Amino acid sequence: RLLEAIRTLNMEKEVRFYQASTSEMFGQSPPPQSEETLFQPRSPYAAAKLYSYWITRNYREAYNLFACNGILFNHESPLRGETFVTRKITMAIADIYHGKKKKFWIGNLDAKRDWGHAKDYVEGMWKIINYRKPEDFVLATGKSFSVRDFCEIAFKEIGINLKWKGRGLREKGYNRKNNKVLIEVDKRYFRPTEVDFLQGNASKAKRLLKWKPKIEFHDLVSEMVKNDIDNFKNQ
């Protein structure tokens, strides 16, 4: 509707339109995924986002609108919604740190994502919308980590080293020091159609927009854990 409004009001030269696309559109396409990678959406969310991607391109090509897609890989911050896996982990660790809970449950430990910081990606979005012409860009760090990696790094922020025992649904994460169970796997948190491995290639954005992420994955995880620990204190 926004694109059609721009067209019917003859505002093509006055309005720049940015569509927030997602790396989930790539689905099972092998990494690294770039602007040229085949889309294979594996969820209703990804399919809907793919429609938005193509309608944006269509209006750009058909009506000469300044309409562009930013295909953003996972970007996190302490403001991430509480239903997302990264925030579930950091909030659970804050609860464990403060003695509110002893363990938590999680889904696929081996799903790999290209996680960056929202601050870097907002800067990238600004660069996309201010580029000299409308184009589509992938924004990504080029590095991929598993949910398991995220858990291990996050627990180290409270002085706990994890070790893993078991396989599949029976796998558990233990405190290496006292052998207490901290993480269990629950099939309820698995996706019906999982996306196993996302890792972006943002070379186009680096070349044309002079954009590159500044905040490393470990620093991102550390910031999120510390923020949730502090939030717990303030409750």
How should these model regions be labeled?
Residues 1-77, 119, 125, 129, ...:
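N-terminal Rossmann-like NAD(P)+-binding domain of SDR-like oxidoreductases, especially those catalyzing
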Residues 82-235:
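C-terminal substrate-binding subdomain of Rossmann-fold SDR/epimerase-dehydratase oxidoreductases
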